[in-house]
């Protein structure tokens, strides 16, 4: 992907987020239901892809990846309304005549970068939470699980428009390109060396990351 293409994609997502269409709880639930239906439709293809990439059996693919994502979807569908609700909080003494509230708000445009070892779980599980929180998302699967990346791309393109959820495939060049863009939040799972790069980038651009790193 060329940088101009990545910038254009992010701009489309920023414009879509600015419309407020991702914010209503019912819109979030509808998106989660579309994702759940797509997973059911593509389950056989996902199982075959996980076997091709990692040699995982059907039972391992379901217990360690697909089933866990379905569980997260079910949980979020039950609780997203409560998570998004405005909450009353204590008011500081100096503002005693006022009432104080805490209102959860999405970050905006989120980048999810996932590893090869649990390529479905560690891509789609954080996507579920990003959607439930009201964000738009760019997903970057690992290049080292190409069959699973292709299956996830087909699945996500079947249920979401790219201004809401988009998939970028590729290797280090695409990683570098995406990390240079002004995402509002980054969720990264992978090697410590890459995680350190992800950590340093937000320091310059004032954006928060979530990092799950391992080894070198």
Label the model's feature ranges.
Residues 41, 45, 68, 118, ...:
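Short alpha-helical
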